[in-house]
Amino acid sequence: MFDNQRFQQLVEADNLTGEVISTNSFIIEVKGLDGVRLGSQVLFEDGQRGLVREAYGDRVILFNIDSEKIVPGTLAVVEADLLQVPVGKQLIGRVVDPMGEPLDNKGPIKANQKSGIFNPAPGIMARSMLNEQLASGVPAVDMFFPIVLGQRIAILGDSKSGKSTFLSQLSANQQGTDRIVIYAMIGKRKVDVETLLGNLESSGAMDHTIVVIADIFDSLTLSYLAPYSACAMAESLWHDGHDVVIIYDDLSSHAEAYRQLSLIQEVDPGRDSYPGDMFYAHSSLLERAGKLLGSDKTLTALPVVVTPNDDITSFLSTSIMSITDGQIIFDLNIFRKGIRPAVNAGLSVSRVGGQAQNARQKRLSGTLFQKMAAFHRAEEFSHFGSSLSENSATDMKVGQQIYAALQQTPGELYSLAEQQLLLETVLLGNGQVEIDIKALKQSIIGLKSDVKDDKEFDHHEADFLKKHSQPVDPLLLVTKPEDKTNATS
């Protein structure tokens, strides 16, 4: 008889059994388990678990899911043909590990369903066109690089460039909708985990969020499994009729964990020592997002990639960008200038964003890009030390006002209508008036009525401009501007 009751039950049920013959860190070699399926979940007699990775005749290679060392001679039994995790609504509002075990001291999770974590992506005939915007509450993203429900859009940037702040804002902005957020934290420090959980709790976002955590003290295998487990939880809710947003923070740590496991396993390394199937590991994960034909429900994926020194040309960065439908890049140099959010407008793009915008929003986005381009040209001229022409000075003024309007603290969130009112009011002034941006924002947020048609927009914008502006001295427009702190790339 075995001390582990679950192990005893599986053995008595005549499940395949084997014996550990060698271990190397998180790699376990088992003799027996003949005919076992790749991806099966294995239970060891000491209660630890493993994932079947490779099979060579009567020898099987497993990843150790847990952190404790397994000694040769330990018996193993197949627990399930697929590695499965609990899924369903019971996980909403909870913090779990990649195996679905609770980490929040709120008691056990009574999930009624389980799902395999390596599910195939929906086929092309099961998908529908993307056409509805996912509002993040951040004008620098929503008005320039709209995220569409069902899209896969990468979030790139160096450490401490504002990525996590933006993702927390996006999560909080889903309050009041039926959308559920799955936030996978991979290989993170305890302080980063606590900061995120604190932000989600304080904003109320935790009520519609599932947080999956594999921190730096967990096993490499848990870090490798975390995004797939989170995706399985998201897919279950998606197929049950919910719009779901999943955040993978971050796939750089996931790739690092997979690289270490592969090197320990003595897999031949490829570029940057990553295994040869690194691209497949991420593409098979991200392809699981989309919009379902019939229900029109969506799974939106936001993979995060850390770009040291703002280098977006690395293997991992370019690999993720080639899989996704766009990228939002946070620039550390812009962040250091005090601009929040520090989005690099020149390198960011949303390839399907236009499909979710109406005609007025498209005109606004186009005008904003034109005004920002004119601002940068005028700024370059100002470096020569001579006075600016009236047109260039106006371009400078408009650009500075746009940047002031885009400046945003972590606690600020704006609906799409509020963002349009804010930026269209600034453009309406055309640099000919001084605008009190702070007072303008307060008035727009205080406007509780739902502004829908063009006449209402035009009326409110003219009214806001009249209330919160005063004429600019014409003599000031042709002098060299002294404030260049708002420049960006």
PLM features per residue range, with description:
Residues 20, 73, 95, 147, ...:
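Residue-level signature of catalytic and energy-coupling elements of molecular machines
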Residues 162-166, 170, 176-180, 185-186, ...:
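Conserved P-loop NTPase nucleotide-binding/switch module
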